[in-house]
């Protein structure tokens, strides 16, 4: 049972109304390699793509922060007996903290991926193990990097939203669902120690949680791998308001590498405030919409963004703009897509409150960012 939000908490929850701050960006990989103040606001990433030297730590390694975390987990201490974790950010943090190192080891030691049947995937979900639902698909290589390791082999390029580490015949396996590309269910061998893993998962106490596919009868309208909790779920109420009313305009200029003194600023008839500096344009709409665009200088030799670097750049920019005005909520990666035709990434972030994703009326996503190797619009 959860307590409703206090009035103070409601007042702090900014940016979640229909007029909430929406960030629409189109940024060129060429610009990222050498041309804008956008590179300077966060630092740390480097190496040809995001600047020359500013982005490396003292050990010469790029630094990344996780853009996504599981919004539900299922711990299975013994076959068929589950402990679901949902609707509580504190409990999700605790559970993920307990098993993130195991997930990192499983990813880093994963062998050649083999395709399995859906029945085998479901069997893995019922064995002793841990299931993670990250809310959106992204490359396993990105997840590995966020966890401080790396994947060598074909699995690195596979995208997945749902991942399971399970025990089978004395071995620990990494299984996942590829809902994009060719699709299908896959598993890899790992070097995770079975005894230690089983003991850690065995500390979980079953709470009656189930996957939808385990119900009898099942519900065709629901995703079969949705985690269902037992008992009544009480969610606190939330309120929102236009974030731009409380936004520091100077901080927004700085985040986008603009100067309020150098930019030419004028209002439009609908109340939108437009600021132009060089090839950059920042539009602050009276309805709570913020748009930034930049036309870079073309450079054929500029390196292309990797998916992990594209997500990290987007995360940092979001953190320093819309992320400043989230109140009690947070922004988490919810979508990434790379167009093979245009070389353009579309990266979206959605608001999450206490482990629950939020949908804004009239908006598909909380924040949308597009990065390409071409010009931006």
Give, region by region, the residue ranges found by the protein language model:
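Extended hydrophobic
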Residues: 377
């Amino acid at each position: 049972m959860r307590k409703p939000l206090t009035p103070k908490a409601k007042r702090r929850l900014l940016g979640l109304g229909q007029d909430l701050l929406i960030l629409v960006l189109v940024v060129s990989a060429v610009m990222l390699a050498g041309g804008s103040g956008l590179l300077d606001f966060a630092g740390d990433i480097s190496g040809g793509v995001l600047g020359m030297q500013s982005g490396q730590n003292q050990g010469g390694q790029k630094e990344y922060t996780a853009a996504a975390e599981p919004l539900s987990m299922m711990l299975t201490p013994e076959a068929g007996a589950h402990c679901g974790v949902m609707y509580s950010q504190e409990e999700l943090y605790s559970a993920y903290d307990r098993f993130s190192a195991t997930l990192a080891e499983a990813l880093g030691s994963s062998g050649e991926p083999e395709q399995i049947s859906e029945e085998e995937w479901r069997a893995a979900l019922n064995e002793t193990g841990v299931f993670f639902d990250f809310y959106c698909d992204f490359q396993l290589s990105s997840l590995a990097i966020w966890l401080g390791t790396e994947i060598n082999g074909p699995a690195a390029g596979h995208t997945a939203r749902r991942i399971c580490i399970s025990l089978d015949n004395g071995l620990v396996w990494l299984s996942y669902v590829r809902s994009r590309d060719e699709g299908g269910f896959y598993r890899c061998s790992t070097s995770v120690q079975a005894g230690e893993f089983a003991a850690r998962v065995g500390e979980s106490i079953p709470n009656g949680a189930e996957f939808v596919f385990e119900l009898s009868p099942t519900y065709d309208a629901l995703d079969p791998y949705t985690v269902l909790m037992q008992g009544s779920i009480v969610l606190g109420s939330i309120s929102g308001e236009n974030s731009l009313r409380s936004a520091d305009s100077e901080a927004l200029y700085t985040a986008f590498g603009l100067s309020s003194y150098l930019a030419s600023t004028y209002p439009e008839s609908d109340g939108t405030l437009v600021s132009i500096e060089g090839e950059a344009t920042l539009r602050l709409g009276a309805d709570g919409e913020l748009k930034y665009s930049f036309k870079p200088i073309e450079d054929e030799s500029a390196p292309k963004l990797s998916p992990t670097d594209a997500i990290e750049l987007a995360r940092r920019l979001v953190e320093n703009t819309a992320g400043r005005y989230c109140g009690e909520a947070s922004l988490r990666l919810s979508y990434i897509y790379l167009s093979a035709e245009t070389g353009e990434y579309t990266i979206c972030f959605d608001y999450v409150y206490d482990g629950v994703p939020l949908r804004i009326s009239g908006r598909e996503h909380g924040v949308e960012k597009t990065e390409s190797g071409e010009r931006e619009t």
